[in-house]
Amino acid sequence: MPFVERVFSGVQPTGNLHLGNYLGAIVNFVKMQETHNCIYCVVDMHAITQGVDVWGGPVELARNTREVTAAFIASGIDPKKHIVFNQSQVSGHAELAWIFNCVARMGWLGRMTQFKEKAGKDRENASVGLFDYPVLMAADILLYRATHVPVGEDQKQHLELSRDIAQKFNNDFGDSIRAQGTNDGLFFPLPEPFITGPATRVMSLRDGTKKMSKSDASDNSRINLTDDADTIAQKIRKAKTDPEPLPTEEKGLEARPEADNLVGIFAALADRSKADVLRDFGGGQFSSFKNALAELCVTKLAPIAGEMKRLVADPGHIDAILNEGSDRARAIADETMKLSKDIVGFIRRR
């Protein structure tokens, strides 16, 4: 019996969502809901794996969780057709993560490059949660026996670990799984990356060699999803460029990071190729191109900012969406945990 095709997407509530988050992830989340059964999770348990100085404390975490939810809804995700919830409301995430902690090997986690990057040189003071982050991510995905996960370059290694954990669980408990009569001895699927086409990598508006980031000291380096129309237009017009005209061919963007970034943003927002954009603007000055880009950004993003502002002003409404979504998520998760506990040999309440 094949697994039900299901896509699991998670976003950390780290605050200050920006254009990079929108074009790199949220746009694709909106597109895939038209063709797939989707679960959208605000992964607030992952958010606290680093120090409180990073995630901001309880008040900030709650505010950021609601802001991510508002961004989902304002961008077009339908919480009635698909599941939108926050991770901490479903205890199965933590329960399954513990089982997976006993399946995963230390050597597997020791090879995870993101831990090394986030912990830096002071690894002895990093939290166990940060080291164990990939195991919780595997539990997030497999709790819903999701078959596909949209991942960026920085998460591909973690998805591979999820597959390894699923495979080892299936092997370690094969006899018990077969006794349950489940999928020819396979309880968990091996989740595949969800491919939506080339991802848009959005760079800083002040330095085209660096990713757009919420942690950049300059607010002019990014377009926040909460920026109003005037602020968006002003940031685009102040964006760093070089003195040369725009090239007429895509190859001419090489070694011109700021030009490449702005053309890429235009292409992504207009759903066109860079070559197509350059056919319209190649050979011209940046001033006229920036005016067109500012207008496009305002057209696409200002309505999202307005709707986010409206939603965030009513936290009770957002909480109701998360509560309803968590009830639907829990119905799936509870069935997975019931069977997982039976397979492992845990005695559970009946």
Curated annotation (Swiss-Prot):
Binding-site positions, ATP: Q12, P13, T14, G20, N21, G152, E153, D154, V202, K211, M212, S213, K214, S215
Any one biological process term the GO annotation gives: tryptophanyl-tRNA aminoacylation
A cellular component term, taken from the record's GO annotations: cytosol
InterPro entries assigned to the protein according to its UniProt record, in alphabetical order: aa-tRNA-synth_I_CS, aa-tRNA-synth_Ic, Rossmann-like_a/b/a_fold, Trp-tRNA-ligase, Trp-tRNA-ligase_bac-type, Trp-tRNA_synthetase
Signal peptide stretch: none
Superkingdom classification of source: Bacteria
Motif 'KMSKS' region mapped to chain: 211-215
Motif ('HIGH' region): 13-21
Pfam families on file: tRNA-synt_1b (PF00579)
Compartment(s): Cytoplasm
Keyword line: Aminoacyl-tRNA synthetase, ATP-binding, Cytoplasm, Ligase, Nucleotide-binding, Protein biosynthesis
The protein's Enzyme Commission number: 6.1.1.2
Assembly and binders: Homodimer.
Function per UniProt: Catalyzes the attachment of tryptophan to tRNA(Trp).
Record's protein name: Tryptophan--tRNA ligase
Organism encoding this protein: Bradyrhizobium diazoefficiens (strain JCM 10833 / BCRC 13528 / IAM 13628 / NBRC 14792 / USDA 110)
